[in-house]
Amino acid sequence: MEVLIWKARRMLESRQEGRVLLRCPIALGREPVGPKEREGDGRTPEGTYYICLIKEAGKYGKSLGLSYPSPEDAARGFAAGRIDEGALDAVRRAWANRVRPPWGTAL
């Protein structure tokens, strides 16, 4: 399955083998333009992620948790001094096991 997001249109599309399964509107962070760099910047991540959490009935309805940060996001954060080597390794392990990466980092 593939999930595509168009931030400018605020639209999500889910596809399987090229066939559209779902198309629906989405909500984004308070500052959706530009790449996400750190915790609290209000930006929506851009890149390739997997769904690591499905919340059926949250405050705003159903939500999908993305596997942010990715190893690439974490490597940039490590290079910029935002996270330490332990956090970088934790993100890499989470991605290797296809589980939720740590969300409590400075990213």
Predicted segments with their positions:
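Cell wall/extracellular polymer interaction/catalysis modules
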Residues: M1-L107
